[in-house]
């Protein structure tokens, strides 16, 4: 289980999170739901190590991950970014194997086998040699998910996974996330869309701006 205990975060004089505690059950999909400016993306960035908490603890199965960097936690916590962040000069397969070979020190052969397995799972086996400009928004989203999964994380975080897509694709994204449910992986999804949240959530955490 992933837990945050009594965490706070400010930017300058503006307090974003104030003494927040939540648990994220293993094998479940937890949705962090709320309006823009409510702190949901800040919370996700702190969980993933992209930002640091001002105070409080982050625990994964009792292991203290508080304020460790995203790179230090990359084998434990994966992130699917809102804008996908694919490298345009690399093809799909190269995008996916880059981190496992550099961070996890996997051989190129092992990383490629894992990447192809992820692409097959996500229905992209025929796109491994394509570049990002050749992909639709939904395909880029699935490549970003495959890249995160290739790091074999125990926690997979999504930042507004439908915001960069056409409205009609939100159901496809929900189906992908539901199909990835596993007893060994916690999924955390940030969204402002209550309809999307209802489709996927085992647990919902609502956040509001601090007044």
What is each stretch, according to the model?
Residues 150-154:
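A short, proline-enriched helix->beta-strand linker immediately N-terminal to the Walker B motif
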Residues 48:
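Helix-to-loop junction immediately C-terminal to a conserved catalytic motif
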Residues 131-135, 139:
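Conserved ABC ATPase signature
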Residues 64-78, 108-109, 182:
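ABC ATPase NBD coupling module
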Residues 167-169:
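Helix N-cap at the start of a conserved alpha-helix in ABC-type nucleotide-binding domains
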Residues 156-159:
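Catalytic Walker B motif of ABC-type/P-loop ATPase nucleotide-binding domains
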């Amino acid at each position: 289980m992933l837990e945050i205990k009594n965490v706070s975060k400010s930017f300058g004089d503006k307090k974003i999170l104030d003494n927040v505690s939540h648990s994220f059950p293993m094998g479940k999909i937890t949705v962090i739901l709320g309006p823009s400016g409510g702190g949901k993306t800040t919370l996700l960035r702190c969980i993933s190590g992209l930002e640091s908490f001002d105070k409080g603890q982050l625990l994964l199965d009792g292991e203290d991950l508080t304020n460790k960097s995203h790179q230090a936690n990359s084998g434990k916590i994966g992130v699917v970014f809102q804008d996908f962040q694919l490298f345009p000069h690399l093809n799909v397969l190269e995008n996916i194997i880059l981190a496992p070979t550099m961070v996890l020190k996997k051989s190129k052969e092992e990383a490629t086998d894992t990447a192809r397995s992820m692409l097959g799972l996500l229905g992209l086996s025929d796109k491994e040699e394509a570049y990002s400009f050749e992909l639709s928004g939904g395909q880029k989203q699935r490549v970003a998910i495959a890249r995160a999964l290739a790091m074999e994380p125990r926690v997979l975080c999504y930042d507004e996974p439908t915001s960069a897509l056409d409205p009609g694709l939100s159901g496809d994204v929900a189906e992908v996330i539901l199909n990835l449910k596993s007893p060994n992986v916690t999924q955390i999804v940030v969204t402002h869309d209550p309809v999307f949240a209802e489709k996927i959530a085992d647990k919902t955490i609502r956040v509001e701006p601090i007044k």
